[in-house]
Amino acid sequence: MAEAPQVVEIDPDFEPLPRPRSCTWPLPRPEFSQSNSATSSPAPSGSAAANPDAAAGLPSASAAAVSADFMSNLSLLEESEDFPQAPGSVAAAVAAAAAAAATGGLCGDFQGPEAGCLHPAPPQPPPPGPLSQHPPVPPAAAGPLAGQPRKSSSSRRNAWGNLSYADLITKAIESSAEKRLTLSQIYEWMVKSVPYFKDKGDSNSSAGWKNSIRHNLSLHSKFIRVQNEGTGKSSWWMLNPEGGKSGKSPRRRAASMDNNSKFAKSRSRAAKKKASLQSGQEGAGDSPGSQFSKWPASPGSHSNDDFDNWSTFRPRTSSNASTISGRLSPIMTEQDDLGEGDVHSMVYPPSAAKMASTLPSLSEISNPENMENLLDNLNLLSSPTSLTVSTQSSPGTMMQQTPCYSFAPPNTSLNSPSPNYQKYTYGQSSMSPLPQMPIQTLQDNKSSYGGMSQYNCAPGLLKELLTSDSPPHNDIMTPVDPGVAQPNSRVLGQNVMMGPNSVMSTYGSQASHNKMMNPSSHTHPGHAQQTSAVNGRPLPHTVSTMPHTSGMNRLTQVKTPVQVPLPHPMQMSALGGYSSVSSCNGYGRMGLLHQEKLPSDLDGMFIERLDCDMESIIRNDLMDGDTLDFNFDNVLPNQSFPHSVKTTTHSWVSG
């Protein structure tokens, strides 16, 4: 035949290519242009294995037959446009392979098809011309089921056709006479009219598609629901006369708050409204809340979520009653973060500074941190208002030497024991924590009792009184015998603090008992002569102190009259150089000791040294006859102390 020379041109060692995986589409074509192929098949062909003799006698014929079978199957899978452009050679090869398979491969002889040997030929591909005009058909289509439609390759959207559920519902409603149907009628129309639903009308198999019908009726705007006039009847479903959206509308889930323009507009309006409200609050500066909101650290600037956490933290130094600066803000001041080195410059101002700021409370003064630094800070104090208790006495004549907590200037911490125990001879009865009291501001250096401080410091004139919190029975001090004031007598000293706007030393719970012997070495005749000239007769002094009445929330007045007769001028010469401890002034400020001469006119001294209204703090005149009547029951009215300190009356006589 004419195709025989072309069969010879095929390589005798050519073997069928292995079929790629079925999931790949389109399948790759074998390379026919190559004369030699290095591709080998893992398994020999079935025809060659079945007929080894024929394969041995006609290797080229069997190879051509297998290649023709492979090409016939491949032609059914390939697209028409991908078909090779050499139809003549392919057709000749296929024909030669068919002839070889019919004569030698199956019958074992060289008879042609005209010899009468009838064998079932393999399925032949259509000619190249018609093949290019038809869509590709899978291998299964070559069988007897080639006429049935295939779901995967058809253009149908659903199993029943290209119509959607909405289209089917539309056709059902339009087919009715009244152009309206109930839900059950739509179900019936589906089962009767659509072949796919004919066998799915029962309740078990209709749950899925009936649910889809109800879903589409509610989803699409082209269907409207009309209330049925009859009682107990379901509603009518009609087509929307205004048209509505045809087909499927986008899913409602797609129109979320993130991508829907309606929600975006509403959010933008809400944001603008919020911004306008905030700007209005900032503009209304007259309201107190706006002033605090402008403050970055104010509670108004915090959100409600952060306010609880923010308000729970309240540092010790930021309480309303114990702020150094006097500000009643719960916010920590920037000075609270200072180190110990910086606290000194803040707490202890220079000597020239005015003492008009608010004094610290006792709870803040008794801070252990401030107690540690007091010794160093006391050495740096040069203000006249600082504590300069210098009761002179010889070391061998001290009777009782106990540390006394004395006060320093305002804005300082509570005092630690004094550094010089050979010089300070004063004791303490107790230090009890007291309730926070309203602290009054002090004036300048010359505060309420600057003159009285010097008056009590007269050399040898006053034997200072011992005072402290007394029990309700009000112990009265015994008068001091004039004979006690001898060169070797003992003088009991007391720090008396008196002022209308101040508190007693350590709030009246501490008494400084200054016991000192009176040596005869340091004598000052000038002081004694002047004192005897001014006070030629005994001056009884009635001093009202502030005791504590246990069980009562009020302060009582205990008058402790102490008769201090003036001794002989020669005896006073032995006492002249030893002035007793000056009285506490203000918030425990001690007056300076002085060795200067006492003014002859005590009235003039008080007028000169005092810068306050004496009548507002002293009910009686200072120099009323022969007595000094000090009444301080109006100091700290209705003030109660938490502890009652029992103090006995001390009296020292020469032994």
Curated annotation (Swiss-Prot):
Region: Disordered, residue numbers: 1-63, 116-158, 234-344, 507-537
Q: In which tissues is it expressed?
A: Expressed in umbilical endothelial cells (at protein level). Abundantly expressed in skeletal muscle and ovary, with lower expression in the heart, placenta, lung, liver, pancreas, spleen, testis and small intestine. Weakly expressed in the brain, thymus, prostate and mucosal lining of the colon.
User: Which parts of the sequence form the motif Required for interaction with SIRT1?
Assistant: 462-466
Q: Which GO terms describe its cellular component?
A: chromatin; cytoplasm; cytosol; mitochondrion; nucleoplasm; nucleus
Q: Where is the composition biased (Polar residues)?
A: 309-326, 507-534
Annotated site residues (DNA-binding) in this chain: 158, 165, 225
- Assigned keywords, A-Z: Acetylation, Activator, Apoptosis, Autophagy, Chromosomal rearrangement, Cytoplasm, Differentiation, DNA-binding, Methylation, Nucleus, Phosphoprotein, Proto-oncogene, Transcription, Transcription regulation, Ubl conjugation
Q: Where is this region: DNA-binding?
A: 211-218, 234-237
Give me the segments passing through the membrane.
none
| Parts forming coiled coils | none
Give residues where Phosphothreonine occurs: 24, 333
Q: What is the effect of changing residue 515 to R?
A: Does not affect deacetylation by SIRT6
Result of altering residue 249 to E: No effect on DNA-binding
Domain of life the protein comes from: Eukaryota
**Residue ranges, compositional bias (Basic residues):** 264-275
Q: Which residues carry this modification: Omega-N-methylarginine?
A: 251, 253
Any idea which residues bear Phosphoserine here? 212, 218, 234-235, 249, 256, 287, 298, 319, 322, 325, 329
Q: Which CDD domains match?
A: FH_FOXO1
What post-translational changes are documented for it?
Answer: Phosphorylation by NLK promotes nuclear export and inhibits the transcriptional activity. In response to growth factors, phosphorylation on Thr-24, Ser-256 and Ser-322 by PKB/AKT1 promotes nuclear export and inactivation of transactivational activity. Phosphorylation on Thr-24 is required for binding 14-3-3 proteins. Phosphorylation of Ser-256 decreases DNA-binding activity and promotes the phosphorylation of Thr-24 and Ser-319, permitting phosphorylation of Ser-322 and Ser-325, probably by CDK1, leading to nuclear exclusion and loss of function.
Motif range (Nuclear localization signal): 251-253
SUBUNIT field: Interacts with LRPPRC. Interacts with RUNX2; the interaction inhibits RUNX2 transcriptional activity and mediates the IGF1/insulin-dependent BGLAP expression in osteoblasts Interacts with PPP2R1A; the interaction regulates the dephosphorylation of FOXO1 at Thr-24 and Ser-256 leading to its nuclear import. Interacts (acetylated form) with PPARG. Interacts with XBP1 isoform 2; this interaction is direct and leads to FOXO1 ubiquitination and degradation via the proteasome pathway. Interacts with NLK.
Spell out the protein name for this chain.
Answer: Forkhead box protein O1
Recorded source organism is Homo sapiens
